[in-house]
Curated annotation (Swiss-Prot):
The active site is at E199, E415. It catalyses: Hydrolysis of terminal, non-reducing beta-D-glucosyl residues with release of beta-D-glucose. It comes from Oryza sativa subsp. japonica. One of its GO terms (biological process) is carbohydrate metabolic process. Disulfide bonds join C218-C226. The gene is BGLU34. This is Beta-glucosidase 34.
Length: 510
C-alpha cells in the first residue's frame, strides 16, 4: 500500500503498546449504502503500484530501482522477501482487468515504473516499457475502466541514486520532468488523471528520517540503523525537491499538453487523522501541529505558497525556502488532492528533550507523541498492521478539515483499506472470509458519503487499497490488503467476500 509502516518513526512506542491491542469480528453489513449514496459520476476503483504488483524486474529492458537494492539487502524486509515476482501483474494484467470489470469498477489507479521508461533514469527511452503501458492502458479502456496513473510511487531508478543521491539533489527536478513529459507524450491522449507523487511525506520520513524505506538513509540513534544520512535535514530537502518537481511538471503540462489532452494533475497525500489525547490546550495544539507537519508540510505550499508557519518557526534554517519565482510556480499548481487515509492516532504534546536527543529528526521537530491508545484503551479495532486502527468517523472529519483549510478543493480518496495477516495456519477458506474488511469499507464509505452529501465536500472518487494482496514494502508478504487473495506459490487469485460486497454496492442503484 502506499504507506507500509508510515508510523515506524515511533516504532518503539508502538511495540510496547501492541500487546494491549484488542480485536473483534466484524459482520458483513452494507447499511443501505448504494451508488446513489454518491453524486453522479463518482468514481470507484482499486489502487496499486508498479513495484508492489508487476514483478518482471529484469524483463524488457527495465533498469534496477532503489527498492530492488533495498529489498535484497539483508534485514531490511521483515520476512526476507523481495518483489522480483510480486503478484506478476506484468504478465497477468489482462486477467486482473477482467477481475475489475467483473466487480463493476470504474477506474484503476496504477503507477508507471520510471526505470521501465528510462532504465538509467535519463537518456534513451526504452520502447518496450512504453509498449507495455500502452497495452495496459488500452486493455483498461477496452473494458470501460479509466486509468488513473501515478508517475512516482517510490521506485526511483538506482542509477540516479548512484549518480547524485536522487531526491537530495536538485538535478532530480530536471530528470523527473523529462520522464513525466515522456509519459504525457506517450500516454496523455488516453490518460486524463495523473498523480505526480504517491505519499511524498512517507518518502521523506520513512526513507530519509527513520531509514526504513529505500534508499534507507537516517541518522537516528547515532546511525545505529543507517550508515548514511541526516534525519534532521534530508527529509526537508527531499520534500522540497518533490514539491518543486510537481510544480515544474504541472507548468509543462499546462503550457504544452493541457489544451489538447485536457487532463488533470494531483498528488496523493498520506494523512493519518490526529485526535488530541486530552482536552488540554497543549494537546489540542499538538494535534494541530502534528497535522501541519504531515499534510500541511506538503499541501500548504500548493495553496498558500509556503510551508506552515509552525514549521518555519520550529525547523528554522533546516527548512528550505522558496524563492519568489518558485513560490509562484508552486502556488496553484495542484488540480486535485489525492488523499490516502487509513487510520487515526491520539496525539499529545511532548516538550521534553528525550526524543530530540535520541532522534533529532522530524518527529522531534513536531514536539508531539502519537499513539493509538488512551487510558489503556485502543482508539479503534486493530487490523493486522501495528499502525492500522479502524476509526471510520475520521474520514468525515478529515474531509471537512481539507475543505475548510484549503477552500473546498477537488479530492479523490486514492487509497483506503485494511489488512489481514498472512498466516500459514489460516486455511484458504477462512482467509476468504474477510467480513472485517467489508465493514471497514462500508463504514469509511458511509462517512465519506455523509461528508459529500451533508457537508458539501467536493470528493469525486474512491480507490480501495488494494485489488490484490501484494508485496507490502518493508512488511514483505506478511500483510494482505487485497480484495482478492493471492496464493504466493502460484500467484493464483481468489475472490474474498469483500469482492461480492463491492459487486453488490456497484450494481446497486437505489
Amino acid at each position: 500500500m502506499g504507506n507500509g509502516g508510515r508510523c515506524m518513526v515511533e516504532v518503539v512506542i508502538l511495540l510496547v503498546l501492541m500487546a494491549m491491542s484488542q480485536g473483534c469480528d466484524a459482520q458483513n453489513t452494507t447499511g443501505g449504502l448504494t451508488r446513489k449514496s454518491f453524486p453522479n459520476g463518482f468514481v470507484f476503483g482499486t489502487a496499486s503500484s508498479a513495484y508492489q504488483y508487476e514483478g518482471a524486474v529484469k524483463e524488457d529492458g527495465r533498469g534496477p530501482t532503489i527498492w530492488d537494492k533495498f529489498a535484497h539487502t539483508f534485514g531490511k524486509i521483515i520476512d526476507f522477501s523481495n518483489a522480483d515476482v510480486a503478484v506478476d501483474q506484468y504478465h497477468r494484467f489482462e486477467e486482473d482487468i477482467q477481475l475489475m470489470a467483473d466487480m463493476g469498477m470504474d477506474a484503476y489507479r496504477f503507477s508507471i515504473s520510471w526505470s521501465r521508461i528510462f532504465p538509467n533514469g535519463t537518456g534513451e527511452v526504452n520502447q518496450a516499457g512504453i509498449d507495455h503501458y500502452n497495452k495496459l492502458i488500452n486493455a483498461l479502456l477496452a473494458k470501460g475502466i479509466e486509468p488513473y496513473v501515478t508517475l512516482y510511487h517510490w521506485d526511483l531508478p538506482q542509477a540516479l541514486e548512484d549518480k547524485y543521491t536522487g531526491w537530495l539533489d536538485r538535478q532530480i527536478i530536471n530528470d523527473y520532468a523529462v520522464y513525466a513529459e515522456t509519459c504525457f507524450q506517450a500516454f496523455g491522449d488516453r490518460v486524463k488523471h495523473w498523480i505526480t507523487f504517491n505519499e511524498p511525506h512517507t518518502v521523506a520520513v520513512q526513507a530519509y528520517d527513520s531509514g526504513m524505506h529505500a534508499p534507507g538513509r537516517c541518522s537516528v540513534l547515532l546511525h545505529l540503523y543507517c550508515k548514511k544520512g541526516n534525519s534532521g535535514t534530508e527529509p526537508y530537502i527531499v520534500a522540497h525537491n518533490m514539491i518543486l518537481s510537481h510544480a515544474t511538471v504541472s507548468d509543462i503540462y499546462r503550457k504544452k499538453y493541457k489544451a489538447s489532452q485536457n487532463g488533470e494533475l494531483g498528488i496523493s497525500f498520506d494523512v493519518i487523522w490526529y485526535e488530541p489525547m486530552s482536552n488540554s490546550t497543549a494537546d489540542i495544539e499538538a494535534a494541530k501541529r502534528a497535522q501541519e507537519f504531515q499534510l500541511g508540510w506538503f499541501a500548504d505550499p500548493f495553496f498558500f505558497g509556503d510551508y506552515p508557519a509552525t514549521m518555519r518557526s520550529r525547523v528554522g534554517s533546516r527548512l528550505p525556502k522558496f524563492t519568489e519565482k518558485e513560490a509562484a510556480l508552486v502556488n496553484g499548481s495542484l488540480d486535485f488532492m489525492g488523499i490516502n487515509h487509513y487510520t487515526t492516532f491520539y496525539t499529545k504534546d511532548d516538550q521534553s528533550t528525550v526524543i530530540e536527543k535520541l532522534l533529532n529528526n522530524t518527529l522531534a521537530d513536531t514536539a508531539t507523541i502519537s499513539v493509538p491508545f488512551r487510558n489503556g484503551q485502543p482508539i479503534g479495532d486493530r487490523a493486522n498492521s501495528i499502525w492500522l486502527y479502524i476509526v471510520p468517523r475520521s474520514m468525515r472529519i478529515l474531509m471537512n478539515y481539507v475543505k475548510d483549510r484549503y477552500n473546498k478543493p477537488t479530492v479523490y480518496i486514492t487509497e483506503n483499506g485494511m489488512d489481514d495477516g498472512n498466516s500459514p495456519f489460516i486455511s484458504l477458506k477462512n482467509a476468504l472470509k474477510d467480513d472485517k474488511r467489508t465493514k471497514y469499507h462500508n463504514d469509511y464509505l458511509t462517512n465519506l458519503a455523509d461528508s459529500i452529501r451533508e457537508d458539501g465536500c467536493d470528493v469525486r472518487g474512491y480507490f480501495a487499497w488494494s485489488l490484490l494482496d501484494n508485496w507490502e514494502w518493508a512488511a514483505g508478504y506478511t500483510s494482505r490488503f487485497g480484495l482478492y487473495y493471492v496464493d504466493y506459490k502460484n500467484r493464483k487469485r481468489y475472490p474474498k467476500n469483500s469482492v461480492q460486497w463491492f459487486k453488490n454496492l456497484l450494481a446497486s442503484s437505489s
